[in-house]
Amino acid sequence: MALLVEKTTSGREYKVKDMSQADFGRLEIELAEVEMPGLMASRAEFGPSQPVKGAKITCSLHMTIQTAFLIETLTALGAEVRWCSCNIFSTQDHAAAAIARDSAAVFAWKGETLQEYWWCTERALDWGPGGGPDLIVDDGGDATLLIHEGVKAEEEFAKNGTVPDPTSTDNVEFQLVLTIIKESLKTDPLRYTKMKERLVGVSEETTTGVKKLYQMPANGSLLFLPINVNDSVTKSKFDNLYGCRHSLPDGLMRATDVMIAGKVALVAGYGDVGKGCAAAMKQAGARVIVTEIDPICALQATMEGLQVLFLEDVVSEVDIFVTTTGNKDIIMVDHMRKMKNNAIVCNIGHFDNEIDMHGLETFPGVKRITIKPQTDRWVFPDTNSGIIVLAEGRLMNLGCATGHPSFVMSCSFTNQVIAQLELWNERSSGKYEKKVYVLPKHLDEKVAALHLGKFGAKLTKLTKDQADYIYVPVEGPYKPAHYRY
């Protein structure tokens, strides 16, 4: 593939769409600063001691204004950073340009092909002859996946000389992963093994990536220590819930200018993301239907006044479909053919397999009309009616808008900073086994406390007698690990 790494005048590598947007990106990064108190507090607390000085951190996470602030927090604490996006549509090009010019190696642009996406991931992991990164910040697990698959292939190659066969799978993305590894074996048959040996650990941002990590210790395939950032309360109950409540209608209105009030909206899944999406649609005046497999989540939905029904029973009545499940094959092409004309179909789960895009793209005679980037009308030949699909079935809030606002991302990214510090500081202590960990409750409460001042909130203080009465320390933590917020 004819992509070339470029370099700044200082020698830092990058590949972005347009470096002339760097000044614009810098202005928006400065604007975000006021809305990210947790990251600012992290810089103030840890900056003087440079706790990750010398650490090489590879990050696979949406390249946005908000993540730009995370990058510059990590570099302010002493780290070197190489960055790629975890989604082909989510990069904000002005943010990428500003960071590439000023702070870190960036390989990301909006509208990457899948081949370009995996090239960027490979570049972010490439730290030269010294091996790979010391730490990874991952979102969805793609950087983690590439290393694990690379090590597996290198072990097979060393044992019996076999190389990966990209034609062995029908999954287009996995074909590209196997192709990268196959080419790597020609130049360095121990490339990913050396990465594994250097790596301290990974902090994983999202539900989908965390699910993958929890499977690995059971089958013995986990190669390095992971911290599950997603299940910190100050991530999942804020980013996933309130972030989606903000960014779903933003993406819908930017992409389609649709009036949500009076429409029928279906939200597939009623976890934290689904709850935020359903609340957004209800608050905007839509009648909301939920599909759900879990009876507890379904009961929660009914208590919020929502209907819980089968997709098949209402598919022809719904105006707006939103998938939030993290699963696959939720809305299939047969469902789409039964939808009303110009029904909107979108996804806010991490990957693009909740909506059957392959079935839609290969449906005989279907016609794709691109209205604007990431907004396509697909017309079926037998009915001459169509549906509107956003962001090609990928994350619509980042593909069609700018994702979650800075404040709620400050909560998530403060957890990421703390997780990276914990991994690095405890790298030789033997504190952690090779299994998935969640940050302790007192750190979760600390992240929340750092964000209260922005709203002028004041915390009531327990007396010693009160604390003893409910069996908690005066300074917290105030809830047990199993408490459900």
UniProtKB/Swiss-Prot annotation:
Record-level GO cellular component terms: cytosol
Comment on bound cofactor: Binds 1 NAD(+) per subunit.
Biological pathway: Amino-acid biosynthesis; L-homocysteine biosynthesis; L-homocysteine from S-adenosyl-L-homocysteine: step 1/1
Amino acids binding substrate: T64, D139, E205, K235, D239
Positions that bind NAD(+): 206-208, 240, 269-274, 292, 327, 348-350, 397
GO BP annotations, alphabetical order: one-carbon metabolic process; S-adenosylmethionine cycle
GO MF annotations in UniProt: adenosylhomocysteinase activity
Uppermost EC category: hydrolase
EC number per UniProt: 3.13.2.1
Pfam families (UniProt xref): AdoHcyase, AdoHcyase_NAD
SMART domains: AdoHcyase, AdoHcyase_NAD
InterPro entries, per the entry: Adenosylhomocyst_ase-like_sf, Adenosylhomocysteinase-like, Ado_hCys_hydrolase_NAD-bd, NAD(P)-bd_dom_sf, S-Ado-L-homoCys_hydrolase_CS
Record keywords, A-Z: Hydrolase, NAD, One-carbon metabolism
Catalytic activity: S-adenosyl-L-homocysteine + H2O = L-homocysteine + adenosine
Cofactor: NAD(+)
Function as written in the Swiss-Prot or TrEMBL entry: Adenosylhomocysteine is a competitive inhibitor of S-adenosyl-L-methionine-dependent methyl transferase reactions; therefore adenosylhomocysteinase may play a key role in the control of methylations via regulation of the intracellular concentration of adenosylhomocysteine.
NCBIfam families, per the entry: ahcY, PRK05476.2-3
Family designation: Belongs to the adenosylhomocysteinase family.
Record-given protein name: Adenosylhomocysteinase
Native species: Solanum lycopersicum
Taxonomic classification: Eukaryota, Viridiplantae, Streptophyta, Embryophyta, Tracheophyta
Gene giving rise to this polypeptide: SAHH
